[in-house]
Amino acid sequence: MKDDKEKALSAALAQIERQFGKGSIMKLGDNTTMDVETISTGSLGLDIALGAGGLPMGRVVEIYGPESSGKTTLTLEVIAEAQRNGKVCAFIDAEHALDPVYAEKLGVNIDELLISQPDTGEQALEIVDMLTRSGAIDVIVVDSVAALTPKAEIEGDMGDSHMGLQARMLSQAMRKLTGNLKKSNTMLIFINQIRMKIGVMFGSPETTTGGNALKFYASVRLDIRRIGAVKNGDEIVGNETRVKVVKNKIAPPFKQAEFQILYGEGINNLGELIELGVKHEFVEKAGAWYSCNGERIGQGKANAAKYLDEHPEMAKDVDTKLRDMFLSKTVVAEDKSEVKEKEKA
């Protein structure tokens, strides 16, 4: 009886693969893509909080927060990191507000970055779908969901009511996009804004635009907030930023990271590296002096960060030690033939 069932299952699997292509159905243990490929966010603390070393490829990511909290800066850092790894990126600028000079300062190669400034929300999402189906794009950023205005709203009069139009448009787009994103291994990042619900007595009155579909389809949701100012004397030179991982399908959620975003420079990753290094004893601190591997690297955090900037191999060493300590990567399932050969050896 058991043999009959196995034969019937094998025949069904063979028919499914013939009809829908190889890999359309498989046993979960045979899946060689169990280990999710990630791209660093530019912040070591946030990579650790995400649990996988960065944002996942082939998934939908939502980054939301108040105005001037660092949403676009964070996505530009991801794009810069992706480009350094030879990946192709696109920026759908629905807000028509991307500053190429600032993007270049953050390390983005603007000569290679694809940019689109669509007229309507439908056009923006259609462009995203076409880029995804091409299989040639690795990272797409949509800035922002709130600016994805439905065509009917643009063509209508100013006082017209368009209840639920944007939510319906996004819900349909999500249904179309998620399968294609997985197949082409493309990361899609949506930047979103915060709105207030009226008449909320208990719980948070905050909500994001575009309905509930994006909340469900996103594998990672990040809540980014400005929590203070970075000062050099009396001059404000940046923001203290906190990011909460509100939803995470690839690792445990609800972790958070704090880092500095410096004006004109982006995430202060070297300062963060020193703080985490001291906390976990990869960098020694005696008074105001910082040392690494028995070598003094500077008096004060700013000088120590400058030293690491001039000695990238030392910064890389501390970064690697911290990542090895926190990020235990899932081992990719190997091809069975390779496993058998190893067992014989």
UniProtKB/Swiss-Prot annotation:
Record-linked Pfam families: RecA (PF00154), RecA_C (PF21096)
Gene Ontology molecular function: any one: ATP hydrolysis activity
Keywords attached to this entry: ATP-binding, Cytoplasm, DNA damage, DNA recombination, DNA repair, DNA-binding, Nucleotide-binding, SOS response
Domain of life: Bacteria
Cellular localisation: Cytoplasm
InterPro entries given in the database record: AAA+_ATPase, DNA_recomb/repair_RecA, DNA_recomb/repair_RecA_CS, P-loop_NTPase, RecA-like_C, RecA-like_N, RecA_ATP-bd, RecA_C_sf
Gene3D superfamilies hit by this protein: P-loop containing nucleotide triphosphate hydrolases
Binding site for ATP: G65, P66, E67, S68, S69, G70, K71, T72
Family note: Belongs to the RecA family.
Functional note: Can catalyze the hydrolysis of ATP in the presence of single-stranded DNA, the ATP-dependent uptake of single-stranded DNA by duplex DNA, and the ATP-dependent hybridization of homologous single-stranded DNAs. It interacts with LexA causing its activation and leading to its autocatalytic cleavage.
Protein name as catalogued: Protein RecA
Protein's organism: Colwellia psychrerythraea (strain 34H / ATCC BAA-681) (Vibrio psychroerythus)
